Amino acid sequence: DKDMGETEVRRRALELLRQANAEREAELVERLINLQAMGANAVVGLDDVLQAVSDKRVEALIISDGFRYHGYIDEASGFVVSNLARSPLAENELAEVEDVVDTAVAATVAQGGHVEIIADNLALEDAGRIGAILRY
């Protein structure tokens, strides 16, 4: 439309970008869920994701916006866990961290993976609010 002002053009462009991003995010979550369901290179849920982070296997860490969780880390090895019952290490060998999700983000980036923060996706919420597509 030739009569659109600059403000209207920007508003429409921004809306198109938001829509494209929402579609990309939905496709990414769908891919994650499908890979995990097939037993392929993906995991969902905090415990399995933290194990994959600890094993340095995460290619893409996918997190629901605002997801935080208390947990523990072995600073020497980088082992991260939210549930002490799943830890091969004793509690006194681990340092308490306020947010293991943030720790997982930092570890994933340091290991060359990338992180996607996803807003308002019910499939990801139902899968435990966190998942990872794995390198192997």
Protein language model annotation of sequence segments:
Residues 1-136:
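Terminal alpha-helical anchor/extension segments at protein ends
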